[in-house]
């Protein structure tokens, strides 16, 4: 509540910042403009503080889950815990002709393939440390969009294997963090990191502008 109130108070001071804030999207042929609130939340750094509770909640959950796997047995030391998880997800209960509800045949075959080829020996490390990195990234605000994307990817994979738990909730919250990647980490490392790294499409646009400038002959020639 305190963070939300602070965010709205900061937003009320926008005219005092003397910083031009453009909340209207450029509308061209076929372009549909976004609602003002949506543009402010996803693209205005003055509202970045409102993303903190969501980042901390999801990040803490991922870090806790990853730390448990790294410190525990069967994940980074051979992957036997993951092998057991895959086995349970692909085992057809006695007296039934199909896998448990919530699993998909094609994904079940994929899990069996990984199980038979002993991918769990390295996949366990990937999942355990991946969860830790996702949690740290969200908590410190470093590459929030990428961290949230890989978090939702793991949630989606766990869900396909028939594991509900908190996966649907974290998946939904992670999607919002992916959408707000430009400002969700502004109150964190992304404030420095994103301007430094830039974006692929930004580099393409800059190249096209430079190339167009050099290729256009001066007026009057």
Model-derived features: where do they sit?
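Extended, low-polarity transmembrane helix blocks
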Residues: 1-133, 140-221
